[in-house]
């Protein structure tokens, strides 16, 4: 616990104690696992800006994935209720961090319940685009993090739906050779659709706010770490797909070439910002190799660096994937519902170890 620096901090601590005490009292008088998960959510999402959710509480929440579907559903409902009923930026950020941990470390049954909540779906999935906490300068700064982080996680879930598995999930079993064979069986259209989604996710990652000046650095650092891990996972996926397009370079249609060029340009525009986010040496050689592959693919499909202008003139008539079109598709693909199942366990492999690069809990970048 950080020290109390304002009356608002004191009120937040009192609220934490009151809500946790009430939940603990009720939980002690019942055998319901639902109340146990609810208590862990409360303990993981305190009003304290100096600490992210504790590993012990995260482990209890993630354990909901080892039970029944009803158990997993109740755990997700507790998280979402906490997220949607709070007006505190710290509580909201910690709730979003829990969601991110479920995507990365949760078992499939828990991830599945997260992906279908709410059943109706919607573009503003986490409903935080208008979030404002005006209690203090710090809360005002952290509010921008809440709005961005919620949108980023919406993109992460959307991209996962397109890919057919959860990006950056550590529940991976398929080896590199088998995975590459699966990718080679995809059509150009499927590959381009997946590349478009992955690049869109990295573009959203680039919009991460600057570190708050007034405090909350530990929360921001934790989020940056998680996003950095997603960055590594995303370029793993892109690497395989760009290699596949190298093999198909002589058979690409003009339209496919245009879409690939657009994706490469969008990706390159992210490079500098992504390097700022991921500024350490972890996997630095691999990351540099990926950007080298991007340059190589550009050259293979026609000295594109020199011919971008000519190709771009054709885009207007061809129908570039612009933002309006992407937004129109977002709602349709965001939630992984039972009526529109994702290919988790069939030909698209639900558990894939891209290049056998396990993403650990340590700071990657």
From Swiss-Prot:
Q: Does the keyword Membrane apply?
A: yes
Identify the keywords attached in UniProt to this record, alphabetized.
Coated pit, Cytoplasmic vesicle, Endocytosis, Golgi apparatus, Membrane
Check the record and name the CDD domains matching this protein.
Answer: ANTH_N_AP180_plant
InterPro entries this protein is in? ANTH_dom, ANTH_N_plant, AP180-like, ENTH, ENTH_VHS
The Gene Ontology biological process annotation of the record reads:
clathrin coat assembly; clathrin-dependent endocytosis
Which GO molecular function terms does the record list? phospholipid binding
Q: What is this protein called?
A: Putative clathrin assembly protein At4g40080
Q: Which organism is it from?
A: Arabidopsis thaliana (Mouse-ear cress)
